Amino acid sequence: MAEETQHNKLAAAKKKLKEYWQKNSPRVPAGANRNRKTNGSIPEKATSGGCQPPRDSATGFHREGPTSSATLKDLESPCQERAVVLDSRSVEISQLKNTIKSLKQQKKQVEHQLEEEKKANNKKQKAKRVLEVQIQTLNIQKEELNTDLYHMKRSLRYFEEKSKDLAVRLQHSLQRKGELESVLSNVMATQKKKANQLSSRSKARTEWKLEQSMREETLLKVQLTQLKESFQQVQLERDEYSEHLKGERARWQQRMRKMSQEICTLKKEKQQDMRRVEELERSLSKLKNQMAEPLPPEPPAVPSEVELQHLRKELERVAGELQAQVKKNQRISLLNQRQEERIQEQEERLRKQEERIQEQHKSLQQLAKPQSVFEEPNNENKNALQLEQQVKELQEKLGEEHLEAASQQNQQLTAQLSLMALPGEGHGGEHLDSEGEEAPQPMPSVPEDLESREAMSSFMDHLKEKADLSELVKKELCFIHHWRDRRHQKTHHLLSEPGGCAKDAALGGGHHQAGAQGGDEGEAAGAAADGIAAYSNYNNGHRKFLAAAHNPADEPGPGAPAPQELGAADKHGDLREVSLTSSAQGEAREDPLLDKPTAQPIVQDHQEHPGLGSNCCVPFLCWAWLPRRRR
């Protein structure tokens, strides 16, 4: 485009130059000088630059040419005209040079403009390319915007539909809200009415409960003071009883020392009796030898028949005494052997029972937790009854053994004392006559195991160990009684409470159900009651044991068997078994707690299941658990 415009401009400039040269071409006619003279305007025409049109000169030349009457003046001055023309042409040339210069300048300007236009065109082309690229990117962006617009329109339609649904739901929810508010207002009104009605009742109930709690608190305080006083009295009684026990122990030790001294004397007497028996045997052998010897030719004085009969009787008596003494010694040795076997068996049973007790003590620690107490109270009551029965059985067996040993020792001592009280056996005829008339009496003897002082001391230590074991068993029995009584009392208290329920009583969590009414005072009262009950049961059991120990051999205690039964048991070589069910029934008949409503189903359940008495897996309740439970 720029090149075409440049060519067009150059062509236009060339045309202008041709026209200018044509206009300024030199054509002067012959009658020009005359015209200049007449007109008087020759210098003006020359100065005007010869701009006369060629048509006029041509017309003047042709107008004067055919005429032959041209003046000489006009023809005489052609040189002057040409000089004028030359001057005019020089002027025109200078003007043309100026115009050429101006044209060259214009050309330079035009070329400069062309270069600038080229640069501008290049810039425009570059800008055009950039614009085309931008147009393409804009087209792509336009397409993307169209797609986005389409998606936006679709989403707008979706949201419009959703907003319509939400508006409908909002209307429904507002309607539902209005309905619920109306219902709520009605319910609140009814509740206010009911609250107003119940407030009066609740006030009366709370006042009644408050009064009852105050009464119970006063009763508990009174009971606490009474229990403290009784606890102090029991402590004093315990001190007195401990002093009494110390005195009894010293008395028993003195008696045992006396018995040991008497046994030593009896041993000496036995040795003397053995010597007498040997002397009698020697005399008997001498008599036999004398009787067996032949009579001399001169017989001496023959003894009378009375003397011979007396000697025979004495011989028979001595032989009977020897046989009775041998039999008695054998019987006593057998009794001692059986007693030792039974003691060993009993020790083995006690050892096994201690192992079971240790195992059950571990299980009891788990059962002592509140969860186990709440879960299986009936099983615990049954186990407590079972353990109590087993402890009673062991106590009866130990009591039987102690009573049997004591009765045997008492019989031996009484027999020895009675024989010691009799007059000594002489060698005279009167003494032989009196002995012959009386029935033959057996000679007392001491067990072979008691021949030495060491055996006697070991036997006494064994008896002390058994006594200590029986005391421990009685303590455990007393604790079981106390624990069962405490459990029944707490369950009965829970059942008798106005706000209590049968479920809590059935669960058996007595000390866990203590509320704010008891507090620390209730715990202290419970601890004092526990100590009093345990100590009273312990005193009763120990008094019974002392009474059984002080009973003579011919008058056995109420819990001990007769000597004939003991002898029969010794012949069979085993201990008499005790029925746990019968003891449990007897205990149930004697137990004052059966009048309570909570104790009856427990005893009934125990009677319905007699196999529980033979079960060895029994939880052992030790004294160490009691203070921990009180915490």
From Swiss-Prot:
Keywords: Coiled coil
Biased composition (Basic and acidic residues): 352-362
Gene symbol of the encoding locus: GOLGA8T
Keyword hit for Coiled coil: yes
Similarity field: Belongs to the GOLGA8 family.
Coiled-coil stretches noted in the UniProt entry, renumbered to this chain: 86-148, 224-411
GO biological process annotation, one example: Golgi organization
Chain intervals for the UniProt region annotation (Disordered): 1-76, 352-379, 423-445
Protein name (record): Golgin subfamily A member 8T
Domain of life: Eukaryota
Annotated Gene Ontology cellular component terms: cis-Golgi network; Golgi cis cisterna; Golgi cisterna membrane
